[in-house]
Amino acid sequence: MKWLLTLFIALSALCSCDRKDLQVKDYSFDTTYSMVDTICWKDERIALQLSIDNYNAEEELKLQYRINGSIEDTLVINGQKTLEPVTFDPHIDKSMTMHYSPKQKGANVICLTLSNSHFSRQDYITVRAKEEVTYDYKYNGYEIHITTIEGV
């Protein structure tokens, strides 16, 4: 009977304690990404321009950009070659430019992943020569615009 009284006291204390420390911070803020894919077919080079506006998060975003399921070994980000996912701070880096040469001619499937510890968004884009496509979607308070434009 004593254990029952102890259990009752413990449950009462648990229910009456202030749970403000367990509140989850709202990360559904208004953020706009303007993303332009410029496809240059003469030299088979693709350029990605990623611009971020109104970014209020407290941490960096990680950008992964893959073609046909693999990271290109010729991926150049802001003038530097890299094989790792790109991490950047949108408060400082308002834009990022990537250039790389796809190993496969014709249609290329591009997998784009934007993520931090609070969200992750992944999309697959099929890009073909002489084609212009725009993708618009909202996710967790984010507005993300992706436009593919044929290179000149």
State each model region's role.
Residues 84-97:
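Aromatic sugar-binding surface patches on proteins
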Residues 19-76, 80-81, 130-144, 149-151:
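Acidic/polar, low-complexity intrinsically disordered N-terminal segments immediately downstream
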Residues 100-104:
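Residue-level recognition of secondary-structure-to-loop junctions
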Residues 94, 106-110:
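Exposed beta-strand face motif in extracellular beta-rich ectodomains
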Residues 13-16:
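C-terminal motif of bacterial Sec signal peptides marking the signal peptidase cleavage site
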Residues 114-118:
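Surface-exposed loop/turn motifs at beta-strand-loop junctions within extracellular Ig-like
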Residues 1-4:
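Positively charged n-region of N-terminal signal peptides that target proteins for export
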Residues 121-131:
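C-terminal edge beta-strand
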